[in-house]
Amino acid sequence: HLLDFRKMIRYTTGKEATTSYGAYGCHCGVGGRGAPKXAKFLSYKFSMKKAAAACFKYQFYPNNRCXG
């Protein structure tokens, strides 16, 4: 949940998530649409999608690689 994530950032860093990190990362416009701003983030986005796909294919039966 996005609000929980915001609270976690505030608790962990002491910073307001929206003003401190709102323009950071792969956010490329309203709704996250658009291409990543740097090659670093494009690579990161690909890695995250690959990891999510590896876990989601096992969502209906146990998989030791997916924790959390």
Swiss-Prot record:
Q: What are the protein's UniProt keywords?
A: Antimicrobial, Bacteriolytic enzyme, Calcium, Cell membrane, Disulfide bond, Hydrolase, Inflammatory response, Lipid degradation, Lipid metabolism, Membrane, Metal-binding, Mitochondrion, Mitochondrion outer membrane, Phospholipid metabolism, Secreted
One of the GO BP terms on file: killing of cells of another organism
Regarding pH, the record states: Optimum pH is 8.5.
Localization, UniProt: Secreted; Cell membrane; Mitochondrion outer membrane
The record's remark on the cofactor is: Binds 1 Ca(2+) ion per subunit.
Membrane topology label: Peripheral membrane protein
Main subcellular localisation: secreted
Q: Which SUPFAM superfamilies match?
A: Phospholipase A2, PLA2
User: What do the Gene Ontology cellular component annotations say?
Assistant: extracellular region; mitochondrial outer membrane; plasma membrane
Spell out the molecular function terms from Gene Ontology.
Answer: calcium ion binding; calcium-dependent phospholipase A2 activity
| Entry superkingdom | Eukaryota
According to UniProt, the reaction catalysed is: a 1,2-diacyl-sn-glycero-3-phosphoethanolamine + H2O = a 1-acyl-sn-glycero-3-phosphoethanolamine + a fatty acid + H(+); 1-hexadecanoyl-2-(9Z-octadecenoyl)-sn-glycero-3-phosphoethanolamine + H2O = 1-hexadecanoyl-sn-glycero-3-phosphoethanolamine + (9Z)-octadecenoate + H(+); 1-hexadecanoyl-2-(9Z,12Z-octadecadienoyl)-sn-glycero-3-phosphoethanolamine + H2O = 1-hexadecanoyl-sn-glycero-3-phosphoethanolamine + (9Z,12Z)-octadecadienoate + H(+); 1-acyl-2-(5Z,8Z,11Z,14Z)-eicosatetraenoyl-sn-glycero-3-phosphoethanolamine + H2O = a 1-acyl-sn-glycero-3-phosphoethanolamine + (5Z,8Z,11Z,14Z)-eicosatetraenoate + H(+)
Cofactor(s) needed for function: Ca(2+)
Q: Which residues form the signal peptide?
A: none
EC top class, in one word?
Answer: hydrolase
Q: What Pfam families would the database entry show?
A: Phospholip_A2_1
Binding site residues for Ca(2+)? H27, G29, G31
Residue pairs linked by disulfide bridges in the UniProt entry? C26-C66
Q: What is its EC number?
A: 3.1.1.4
According to its UniProt entry, the function of this protein is described as:
Secretory calcium-dependent phospholipase A2 that primarily targets extracellular phospholipids with implications in host antimicrobial defense, inflammatory response and tissue regeneration. Hydrolyzes the ester bond of the fatty acyl group attached at sn-2 position of phospholipids (phospholipase A2 activity) with preference for phosphatidylethanolamines and phosphatidylglycerols over phosphatidylcholines. Contributes to lipid remodeling of cellular membranes and generation of lipid mediators involved in pathogen clearance.
Say which family it is in: Belongs to the phospholipase A2 family.
* Protein name listed in UniProt: Phospholipase A2, membrane associated
The encoding gene is: PLA2G2A
